[in-house]
């Protein structure tokens, strides 16, 4: 049986565009196949969901605070009116531990992101030469992808 998806065109497009919007069939399988191909080409990969991302640059790359859920009546004198803020390490911190490898951040459910959040992902890629980002933007009958900047122009400018 011939290899249906070698990943060569995907790899070339990823290198030239740095940020891709991908549309994969809903039955799945293509994502893991492409990730396996990218790992074989020397990428360090990290998969996470885009839901609840907030400010992508802060959430993925910087130390930020998160308030725990409210668990009923608590003493106001201890933590003030706003409550306790816990410091959380960046979600993609394990991706940035190695500086010598190319890095691939794969975001699932990217259709929930706004135009400004998608644009900030493109800015993150331009700041770090070794970082590439793939955002799954929904389902399709066949595997398709385009640059994230072209997707923003097509989707939001009309």
From Swiss-Prot:
Its EC number is 7.1.1.-. The keyword Nucleotidyltransferase does not apply. InterPro entries: NAD(P)H-quinone_OxRdtase_su_N. Belongs to the complex I NdhN subunit family. It comes from the Bacteria. NDH-1 can be composed of about 15 different subunits; different subcomplexes with different compositions have been identified which probably have different functions. Coiled coil: none annotated. It is a peripheral membrane protein. HAMAP family: NDH1_NDH1N (MF_01353). Its main location: membrane. Pfam families: NdhN. NDH-1 shuttles electrons from an unknown electron donor, via FMN and iron-sulfur (Fe-S) centers, to quinones in the respiratory and/or the photosynthetic chain. The immediate electron acceptor for the enzyme in this species is believed to be plastoquinone. Couples the redox reaction to proton translocation, and thus conserves the redox energy in a proton gradient. Cyanobacterial NDH-1 also plays a role in inorganic carbon-concentration. It catalyses: a plastoquinone + NADH + (n+1) H(+)(in) = a plastoquinol + NAD(+) + n H(+)(out); a plastoquinone + NADPH + (n+1) H(+)(in) = a plastoquinol + NADP(+) + n H(+)(out). GO terms for cellular component: plasma membrane-derived thylakoid membrane. It comes from Prochlorococcus marinus (strain MIT 9301). The gene is ndhN. It is found in: Cellular thylakoid membrane. It is an enzyme of class 7 (translocase). Transmembrane segments: none annotated. The keyword Membrane applies. This is NAD(P)H-quinone oxidoreductase subunit N. Keywords: Membrane, NAD, NADP, Plastoquinone, Quinone, Thylakoid, Translocase, Transport. GO terms for molecular function: oxidoreductase activity, acting on NAD(P)H, quinone or similar compound as acceptor; quinone binding.
């Amino acid at each position: 049986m011939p290899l249906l998806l070698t990943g060569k065109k995907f790899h070339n497009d990823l290198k030239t565009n740095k940020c891709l919007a991908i549309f994969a069939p809903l039955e799945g399988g293509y994502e893991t196949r492409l990730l396996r191909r990218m790992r074989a080409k020397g990428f360090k990969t990290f998969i996470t969901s885009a839901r609840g991302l907030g400010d992508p640059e802060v959430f993925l790359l910087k130390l930020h605070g998160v308030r725990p859920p409210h668990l009923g009546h608590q003493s106001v004198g201890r933590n003030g009116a706003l409550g306790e803020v816990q410091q959380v390490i960046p979600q993609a911190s394990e991706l940035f531990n190695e500086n010598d490898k190319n890095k691939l951040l794969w975001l699932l459910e990217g259709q929930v992101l706004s135009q400004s959040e998608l644009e900030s992902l493109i800015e993150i890629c331009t700041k770090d030469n070794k970082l590439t980002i793939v955002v799954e933007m929904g389902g399709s009958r066949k595997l398709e992808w385009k640059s994230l900047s072209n997707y923003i122009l097509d989707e939001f400018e009309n």
